[in-house]
Curated annotation (Swiss-Prot):
The lineage of its organism: Bacteria, Pseudomonadati, Pseudomonadota, Gammaproteobacteria, Enterobacterales. It comes from Buchnera aphidicola subsp. Acyrthosiphon pisum (strain APS). NCBIfam families: minD_bact, PRK10818.1. Signal peptide: none annotated. PANTHER family: SEPTUM SITE-DETERMINING PROTEIN MIND HOMOLOG, CHLOROPLASTIC, SEPTUM SITE-DETERMINING PROTEIN MIND HOMOLOG, CHLOROPLASTIC-RELATED. GO terms for cellular component: cytoplasmic side of plasma membrane; cytosol. ATP binds at residues 11-18. The keyword Zinc-finger does not apply. This is Septum site-determining protein MinD. Keywords: ATP-binding, Cell cycle, Cell division, Cell membrane, Membrane, Nucleotide-binding, Septation. Belongs to the ParA family. MinD subfamily. Its main location: membrane.
């Protein structure tokens, strides 16, 4: 059975698209047929992060408006088997995204036997965000450990509970998970960031992953590669743990405590 997962947030710049790409790639690595859809009409960042921007001929809106078939618009990832991308339009009006159009595309993808459909939502409550949430079975709320980011995530939780198809039909609600990004235990210790416990106390939803602040994320993005492919990076390992939890496996949370320096590192001040 296909699982439709929206990756969303109340605030921009929290690593939502990076997370969508990493989770989609990780699921495909596990043998799950996965497609990542960019709902951010007008910006189109997903294909850049996944390194396929030059291969975009048709997009999500072309399919909705009947200018192309889904098979024409879907891009197969060259690095990872089982991984596909449906890019957003960079030039179209955001209102070109319609509920009927999105439902048609999702229904067709389900018929194509995708195991996972990852919906990369724009931040906030614009049309793309509402439609990405509307059809979801599960939601990953991406937030930084900062008061403003957590507060905006709380607003998104309200939208998920009231504006989804599941809420309308009064059936099992969307499963909600917290993904905490750019976590820095040293700054938490200094009181410059909220702790994981603080965020959980505020949002009151299960946590699926904690992604540490890591310069490797920017390097991977600039190279058009998903960070999860960098197995030597802390962020890549944390995303891998997140994917395993999404598949029902238990993983302890790494990178949530300040790394203790060895004697030599303390001696030489490194």
């Amino acid at each position: 059975m296909t699982r439709i997962i929206v990756v969303t947030s109340g605030k921009g710049g929290v690593g939502k698209t990076t997370s969508s790409a990493a989770i989609g790639t990780g699921l495909a690595q596990k043998g799950k047929k996965t497609i990542v859809i960019d709902f951010d009409i007008g910006l189109r960042n997903l294909d850049l992060i996944m390194g396929c921007e030059r291969r975009v001929v048709y997009d999500f809106i072309n399919v909705i408006q009947g200018d192309a078939t889904l098979n024409q618009a879907i891009i197969k990832d060259k690095k990872t088997n089982n991984l596909f991308i449906l890019p957003a339009s960079q030039t179209r009006d955001k209102d070109a995204l319609t509920r009927i159009g999105v439902e048609k595309v999702l229904t067709e993808l389900i018929k194509m036997n995708f195991d996972f459909i990852i919906c990369d939502s724009p931040a906030g409550i614009e049309t793309g965000a509402i439609l990405a949430i509307y059809f979801a079975d599960e939601a990953i709320i991406t937030t930084n450990p900062e008061v403003s980011s957590v507060r905006d995530s709380d607003r998104i939780l309200g939208i998920i509970s009231s504006k989804s198809k599941r809420a309308e039909k009064n059936i099992t609600p969307i499963k909600e998970y917290l993904l905490l990004t750019r976590y820095n235990p040293r700054r938490v210790k200094k009181g410059e960031m909220l702790s994981m416990t603080d965020v959980l106390d505020i949002l009151q939803i299960p946590i699926i992953g904690v992604i540490p602040e890591d310069q490797s994320v920017l390097r991977a993005s600039n190279q058009g590669e998903s960070i999860i492919l960098d197995i030597n990076s802390n962020a890549g390992c944390a995303y891998s743990d997140t994917v395993n939890r999404l598949l029902g496996e238990e993983r302890h949370f790494r990178f949530i405590e300040e790394e203790k320096k060895s004697f030599l590192r303390r001696l030489f001040g490194r």
